[in-house]
Design a protein with these regions (language model features):
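FIC/Doc superfamily catalytic core
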Residues: 53-497
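Canonical positions in the second alpha-helix
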Residues: 2, 35-36
């Protein structure tokens, strides 16, 4: 419809190409992408976001098409795609890659994905899809700036079920096949299940492991950056967290002055008590610290469970500007090689403990064991959230792993993510990733998450669902199930409700 109204609209043309590729119609998709590529900006004209992204999408589309019918366990996108391509794509840089060898063109013998009627699936698979739709809807953020996406819901619901089944097999001492090898599952394999579903649900976004980027990129650091306030623009998604971050900054300022300016601490404290907005912090900082000039940064710390007393770098809060209306208030995590290794060691230790306790749990489902396993799952994902190891999608990927691993332990999440401030104690947050990033430790995150997850014993009917990995072993089968219309799921009785 958009192109009917404006045949040469670049955004519409790009979205047409993206939509076709997402649904497995690669020939039409790449044709539309090529039209955008031919739309070179004029000399001195700034390239549009669509023009910058389209060549990455075309190359990725070719790769996906070539792998449509190859079992997903036999290859690895992070290892297959060239390092510089991944680095430039994740950073949204112009496609200027030296010695880049294009992906092969579309092969005629590999056909596009055909539409699959819901009724053509066996009853068990239909039930699987309906359950996935329900589970995926539980991950929706009910906050301004986050619109529901039913395709993502289904993909991450299926990811949750596949994680559940894979973790159960691991605790029963079964091996999994990943990247062409059969072995015991590690924590990254667990997250990779969710990664593959998130990738195929929206091929527009580069969902890539940052530690698999080229060494040069890692040595410089890879930043996940979020602007909270930029000039007159306020990021509504994170508005609920402004007050919490403001209190944290005030505390850090007091600690700093307590160590470096103890005589002036009372005056600083009195001045900070009058500050109720982030924008008002800059004048205060300039007044009491000549080094502040046009801005300052505050770093958060993440306490280790493995090594008591040790702390890791969390995220950095930056406030710059010279007056109200010209302020930049942002947060970012810097993924360096050293920081990544520290977090990996923490997650490795938690996963080892989780696997050991999971194996005991299968033999003896005592309440104490279940509780310990639940806390380990939430602690492990707490460090994943703070590491932010993916270029995109870390939040929903981590949450689907939480839900799937909890289901493997015999518990399921029945409570939805809260809409906002229900009261002044527990039910006050909206974004699970930001709650983990601003929590003082893994125990605090586990406590507040469990307060609204409303964990209950899992329905026995989950055991009768078919294997997700065996039912959808290729990209083609994954795209087919994401495309299928399941509107009559609403008319059926879903096993989980």
């Amino acid at each position: 419809r958009c192109l009917q109204l404006e045949p040469y609209n670049e955004v519409c043309q790009y979205m047409k190409g993206l939509s076709h590729v997402a649904m497995g119609q690669f020939y039409e998709g790449i044709k539309a992408q090529t039209k955008v590529m031919l739309n070179d900006p004029l000399p001195g004209q700034k390239a549009s976001p669509e023009y910058l992204k389209v060549k990455y999408l075309r190359e990725y589309s070719r790769y996906l098409h070539a792998h449509l019918d190859i079992p997903l366990t036999e290859y690895n996108i992070d290892l297959d795609l060239p390092g510089n391509f991944k680095d430039h794509w994740a950073k949204n840089l112009p496609f200027l890659i030296e010695n880049y060898e294009e992906q092969p063109g579309l092969q005629p013998h590999i056909k596009d994905v055909l539409f699959q009627n819901f009724e053509s699936y066996k009853p068990g698979v239909q039930e699987l899809v309906c359950v996935a739709d329900h589970l995926g809807s539980m991950m929706q953020y009910e906050t301004p700036g986050f619109l529901p996406n039913k395709r993502i819901h289904r993909a991450m619901g299926l990811a949750t079920l596949e994680v559940m089944q894979a973790v159960q097999r691991t605790w029963a001492n079964s091996k999994v096949r990943m990247n062409g090898k059969t072995r015991l599952m590690q924590w990254r394999d667990m997250f990779d299940i969710a990664v593959k579903w998130r990738r195929i649900a929206d091929p527009d976004q580069p969902v890539l492991w940052l530690d698999q980027m080229p060494a040069r990129s890692l040595s410089r650091g890879f930043n996940n950056h979020i602007n909270l306030i930029r000039g007159q623009v306020i990021n509504m998604r994170y508005l609920e967290y402004f007050e919490k971050i403001l209190h944290f900054i005030k505390d850090r300022i007091l600690v700093y002055h307590g160590a470096n300016n103890p005589k002036g601490l009372l005056e600083v404290r009195e001045a900070l008590e009058k500050v109720h907005k982030v924008e008002d912090l800059l004048p205060i900082m300039k007044q009491f610290n000549s080094k502040t000039r046009d801005g300052f940064t505050v770093n958060t710390k993440v306490p280790s469970l493995k090594d008591q007393g040790k702390e890791y770098d969390g995220f950095t809060i930056t406030i710059t500007g010279d007056k109200v209306g010209n302020i930049l208030f942002s947060v970012e995590t810097q993924t360096t090689e050293e920081r990544t290794q520290l977090y990996h060691a923490e997650i490795d230790a938690l996963y080892k403990d989780l696997t050991a306790k999971g194996k005991i749990l299968i033999l003896s489902a005592e309440l104490g064991e279940v509780d310990a396993v639940c806390n380990l799952i939430l602690s492990l994902v707490y460090y994943f959230y703070n590491l932010m190891p993916l270029s995109r999608g870390s939040s929903v990927i981590a949450y689907s792993v939480i839900m799937g691993a909890l289901m493997a332990s015999g518990k399921e999440v029945s409570g939805k993510i809260p809409k906002g401030k229900a009261n002044l104690t527990l039910l006050r947050f909206q974004l699970v990733d930001f709650e983990a990033m601003t929590a003082p430790g893994s125990e605090a995150f586990s406590k507040i998450a469990r307060s609204w997850m409303n964990l209950k014993s899992i329905s026995p009917s989950y055991k009768s669902l078919p294997s997700v990995s065996e039912t959808f072993p290729t990209l083609r089968t994954m795209i087919e199930v994401l495309n299928t219309d399941s509107s009559h799921c609403l008319k059926k009785t879903i096993v989980v409700v």
